[in-house]
């Protein structure tokens, strides 16, 4: 596990702020934080309007469009003319109305803050490393934390329409819930039978025989407080000795 973490760090290098410029991280954030929903992309573009150099937007009477990294990402209308440059917000407002109408039902962490988006970028870049490390140190605490994160992103998916992402996190939540609940069940059972397991012997037919825990297992005969071995009614416990053998028993403990 440790070697895998070291290998990932060597392949990935230093944290993202060390080799991504602020604006590069911002551009990644624009198109990764909300890449599964058009409305999320539009919301980010509107928020980052002060950096119009990142986008090449043009407008005419019949067309508005923007390009990003030489790829046309937004186009409305026909007969586009790229001789007249405009801010990206003008293009988006022409197509989708004013800011207030667009942001009416946007979740707060999309509307507020480029910094939040960069933090999200860092978290997702190092998510596998974090999970590998914390699963090896605090396995169930990590699973519970991941369940909480999954719930947050399910809410985000419902708000923003990113149903694919919501489905992925819902599946993660379900799997981790099963693992955690299974462990909790075992803990509850261990607590429920904390005395029975150490102070008695449960026979195949379900009868409980008291045991002297002070005696070793190999003491004369056994550790039962009552003399002799417990009588096993095979017909009651297994139906027959044949059924017991079919169940894979290596040997039959006869009275």
UniProtKB/Swiss-Prot annotation:
Localization per Swiss-Prot or TrEMBL: Virion membrane
Membrane-spanning segments: 118-138, 151-171
Effect upon mutating residue 34 to S: Complete loss of infectivity
Sequence ranges on the Virion surface membrane side: 19-117
GO CC annotations, alphabetized: membrane; viral envelope; virion membrane
Signal peptide start and end residues: 1-18
UniProt similarity note: Belongs to the arteriviridae GP5 protein family.
Function noted in UniProt: Major envelope protein present in abundant amounts in the virion envelope.
Name of the featured protein: Glycoprotein 5
Organism encoding this protein: Equine arteritis virus (strain Bucyrus) (EAV)
Top-level taxonomy: Viruses, Riboviria, Orthornavirae, Pisuviricota, Pisoniviricetes
